[in-house]
Amino acid sequence: MTSNFRHVALIGKYQASSAGAIGESSRQALDGIARFLQHQGCSVAIEVETASNTGLLHYPSLTVEDIGARCDLGLVVGGDGTMLGIGRRLARFGTPLVGINQGRLGFITDIPFDTYQATLPPMLEGDYEEDSRPLIQACVMRAGQVVFEALAMNDVVVNRGATAGMVELRVEVGGRFVANQRADGLIIASPTGSTAYSLSAGGPMLHPSIPGWVLVPIAPHTLSNRPIVLSDATEVAVEVVSGRDVSASFDMQSLASLLHGDRILLSRSAHCVRFLHPQGWNYFATLRKKLRWNDGDP
């Protein structure tokens, strides 16, 4: 078979234990995928941290920047968290990503591990569905200076401390004052993140084709304070008015401690994450499967 993707990078979440050991099954799984790709005519490299943690050093290893510059495809083996992390880092290169699920839900790593040998060959020949997901560009402003910057694919969450009371947050959209919200926190989620923490907090699911965000209060003091869907073409600003131990998290993978008066500015990034799915993939089938809709129906 001649693959449309000649240079493929494998990225996995295979963290070494405190003793430096790693499960043999995890190593074998990644090695098996690499050998399979080689049999499909692909040149295979492994992301450098993945290679180090698995001990798979007989393949070329590449940094994320090298993957973006030199590889036609990234194959992510793990769960949604693994995909979120690498997706943010590769978005600026436009490298397409395919996910093989070894996590739990697998909303964005949607190929089951036990089916990859049947699913991948048609995709490597160009038979796939492409799906672009926008990123949120966020920065924390303090006294007029940027003190923290991050990208998020899922969400930005402003939270109170674990032992603190409610926070008060001033919310502006497009430079217009919306409200001061008293709550345990506030979630600003993309369509991708609308099926994550936002959904658990009572927010709606946004179809990935919708160019919008959803603002979801966490346990608000006022019951009329409900989620609101916004266009992602406008900037959202969230200012910390009061509260102790307030922080902002970005995809739950990076964290910024906040002070009173800090402003979190959010806008749509210029970069998108490119997902490739098996032919016939659709969003509603994913919802049915992952959320177990219609379980028990004949």
Curated annotation (Swiss-Prot):
Enzyme category, top tier: transferase
Active site per database record: D80
Recorded catalytic activity of this chain's protein: NAD(+) + ATP = ADP + NADP(+) + H(+)
Keywords associated with the record: ATP-binding, Cytoplasm, Kinase, NAD, NADP, Nucleotide-binding, Transferase
Keyword Membrane attributed: no
Cofactors demanded by this protein: a divalent metal cation
Main location: cytoplasm
Gene3D superfamilies given in the database record: Probable inorganic polyphosphate/atp-NAD kinase, domain 1 (3.40.50.10330), Probable inorganic polyphosphate/atp-NAD kinase, domain 2 (2.60.200.30)
Matching SUPFAM superfamilies: NAD kinase/diacylglycerol kinase-like
The EC number(s) this enzyme carries: 2.7.1.23
Keyword Transferase tagged: yes
BP GO terms, sorted: NAD metabolic process; NADP biosynthetic process
Gene Ontology cellular component terms for the protein in this record: cytoplasm
Cysteines paired by S-S bonds: none
Cell location: Cytoplasm
Residues holding NAD(+): D80, G81, N154, D155, R182, D184, T195, A196, Y197, S198, L199, S200, A219, Q253
Molecular-function annotations in GO: ATP binding; metal ion binding; NAD binding; NAD+ kinase activity
Similarity comment: family membership: Belongs to the NAD kinase family.
Function: Involved in the regulation of the intracellular balance of NAD and NADP, and is a key enzyme in the biosynthesis of NADP. Catalyzes specifically the phosphorylation on 2'-hydroxyl of the adenosine moiety of NAD to yield NADP.
HAMAP family in alphabetical order: NAD_kinase
Protein name: NAD kinase
